[in-house]
């Protein structure tokens, strides 16, 4: 089954600083061995002005779980994760996700 690693970034202390470093985060993600596609998405703000449940999502797509599991042992993945935690002043969650085609 296709697998993706999803990074869910909580609301950062400084959105401007996060955005300034996000391009580098994407470059690091694309360098991870076995990554087929990288998708970045920004969470829409709530209409009432209250904080959104998250700030950004970054998806790294792989052919299957084994490819994703192997990829996370690479130096490139270490660099990506290091940058993720550096940027994520509000926190970040990293998930392995089984993609279900519907």
Where are these regions (language model features)?
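Macromolecular interaction modules
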Residues: 1-102
């Amino acid at each position: 089954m296709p697998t993706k690693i999803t990074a869910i970034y909580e609301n950062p202390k400084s959105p401007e600083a996060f955005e300034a470093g996000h391009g580098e985060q994407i470059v690091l993600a694309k360098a991870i061995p076995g990554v087929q596609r990288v998708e970045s998405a920004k969470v829409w703000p709530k209409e009432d002005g209250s904080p959104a449940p998250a700030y950004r999502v970054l998806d790294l797509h792989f052919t299957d779980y084994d490819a994703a599991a192997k990829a996370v042992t690479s130096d490139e993945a270490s660099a990506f994760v290091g940058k993720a935690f550096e940027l994520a002043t509000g926190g970040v969650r990293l998930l392995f996700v089984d993609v279900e085609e519907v």
